[in-house]
Amino acid sequence: MTLEEVRGQDTVPESTARMQGAGKALHELLLSAQRQGCLTAGVYESAKVLNVDPDNVTFCVLAADEEDEGDIALQIHFTLIQAFCCENDIDIVRVGDVQRLAAIVGADDEGGAPGDLHCILISNPNEDTWKDPALEKLSLFCEESRSFNDWVPSITLPE
């Protein structure tokens, strides 16, 4: 038995519980950030915020469905945003369900259709450091993931 096999056996239940906890924390963080008015949605809007005030951004969520995986322009944007977030010490995660994200964040258009939710930034609501328990859980999750060389961990949102 190799070290990877031993490590894989031990961490499967822990990994699943860790992932579920991160998904629940992300759900709570999105709702809290939306209530506080510190949520920016959209690839271009997020890029503007990152360019103008990266020190105020605390967390980044990249979301893409399976059909979005073939969108080369979107993948290039994701790569640039990921690089910018890593360079500026902004925690970042990926979500594979844009519709679930839309159900949490809500619709932006007058027609009720969700706006561009491929990138969501969460900023500090004021000058003081924002102390949100869900944000702290996600920061720890991202830190642990980086220790396993998973720089942009994927999270599954709860139903």
Curated annotation (Swiss-Prot):
InterPro entries: GADD45 (IPR024824), Ribosomal_eL30-like_sf (IPR029064), Ribosomal_eL8/eL30/eS12/Gad45 (IPR004038)
A Gene Ontology biological process term: positive regulation of apoptotic process
Pfam families cross-referenced by the UniProt entry: Ribosomal_L7Ae (PF01248)
Keywords: Apoptosis, Developmental protein, Differentiation
A single GO molecular function term of this UniProt record: identical protein binding
Region (Homodimerization): 43-86
SUPFAM superfamilies in the cross-refs: L30e-like
Gene3D superfamilies attached to this UniProt entry: 3.30.1330.30
Example of a GO cellular component annotation carried by this entry: nucleus
Family according to the record: Belongs to the GADD45 family.
Domain notes for this protein: Two central helices mediate homodimerization through parallel packing.
Subunit structure: Undergoes concentration-dependent homodimerization, which is required for growth inhibititory activity and enhances interaction with PCNA. Interacts with GADD45GIP1. Interacts with PCNA.
Function according to Swiss-Prot or TrEMBL: Involved in the regulation of growth and apoptosis. Mediates activation of stress-responsive MTK1/MEKK4 MAPKKK.
Name of the protein: Growth arrest and DNA damage-inducible protein GADD45 gamma
Biological source species: Rattus norvegicus
Source organism phylogeny: Eukaryota, Metazoa, Chordata, Craniata, Vertebrata
Encoding gene (name): Gadd45g
